[in-house]
């Protein structure tokens, strides 16, 4: 089964606005419009069987609406695997985590940079204590700021990993968008999965190969970061640049199946 573990779709009322915001922040012109129908078409063209759909509440008031959206996707679209969201400022986290678990939500997305908290915030540590091993935890990591100044970075995630050994942790963007040297130093060998999203455009072949070897085939997951990138194109580039065999690609896809219980 082929799985894209890093995609985003948005409610039709806000999709255009969010896609524009992504372009403004990252300077990347998105290939997609952020709608489920577009993602569905692209995943079918790429031979992707299922997509993990991610959202991150940028304010406490967004937690319930965002998770309602995730639960509705879970109920209505078997090809999508939605992750839930939490926020350090949300007051009734245990109840909301219970609700997500009861509705079959398998994971949580954390984006400290967009959500307005640091990865070393004690409030995030409190959330992780509640999470235990109930959810797969996918973290956005990295940006253009130096690690010590950025809300997320490989060093902070390594500290989280050490403090909370139970949950499956995924570091997006091959361990840290624009923080790849730090990812090699801080995260490789630390029982952290990495996904390939938003990395093909920014890594040369040598660094991509180094990251792949350092984390190991059994800890690499395929992710496109739709709507920024297209799964078919990203899968093709990943396969060619790393010279992956069919067995390599099957193993990478099996990693996602395994951690998602599929």
Residue ranges and their predicted role:
Residues 6, 43, 70, 100, ...:
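Conserved, mostly hydrophobic/aromatic
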Residues 9-10, 143, 176, 228:
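Short active-site segment of divalent metal-dependent hydrolases/proteases
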Residues 38-42, 66-73, 96-100, 123-127, ...:
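A general structural detector for well-ordered alpha-helical segments in enzyme core domains, enriched
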Residues 49-50, 58-139, 143-145, 151, ...:
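Active-site gating/metal-coordination segments in enzymes
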Residues 1-5, 15-50, 98, 214-221, ...:
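Mid-to-C-terminal alpha-helical segments outside catalytic/metal-binding sites
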Residues 6-12, 140, 173:
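Histidine-centered divalent metal-coordination motifs
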């Amino acid at each position: 089964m082929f799985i894209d573990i890093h995609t985003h779709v948005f409610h039709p009322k806000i999709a255009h606005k969010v896609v524009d915001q992504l372009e403004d922040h990252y300077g990347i012109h998105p290939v997609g419009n952020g709608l489920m129908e577009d993602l569905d078409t692209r995943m079918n063209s790429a031979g992707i069987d299922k997509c993990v759909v991610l959202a991150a509440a940028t304010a406490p008031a967004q937690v319930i609406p965002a998770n309602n959206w995730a639960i509705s996707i879970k109920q209505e679209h078997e090809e999508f695997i939605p992750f839930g969201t939490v926020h350090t400022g949300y007051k009734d986290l245990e109840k909301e985590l219970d609700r997500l678990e009861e509705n079959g939500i398998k994971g949580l997305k954390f984006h400290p940079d967009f959500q307005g908290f640091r990865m070393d915030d004690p409030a995030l540590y409190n959330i992780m204590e509640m999470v235990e091993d109930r959810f797969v935890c996918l973290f956005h990591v990295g940006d253009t700021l130096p690690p010590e100044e950025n809300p997320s970075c490989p060093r902070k995630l390594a500290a989280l990993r050490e403090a909370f050994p139970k949950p499956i942790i995924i570091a997006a963007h091959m361990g840290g968008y624009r923080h790849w040297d730090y990812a090699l130093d801080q995260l490789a060998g630390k029982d952290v999965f990495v996904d390939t999203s938003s990395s093909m455009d920014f890594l040369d072949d040598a660094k991509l190969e180094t990251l792949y070897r350092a984390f190991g085939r059994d800890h690499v997951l395929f992710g496109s970061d739709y709507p920024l990138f297209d799964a078919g194109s990203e899968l093709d580039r990943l396969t060619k640049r790393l010279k992956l065999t069919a067995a390599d690609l099957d193993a990478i896809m099996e990693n996602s199946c395994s951690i998602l219980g599929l």
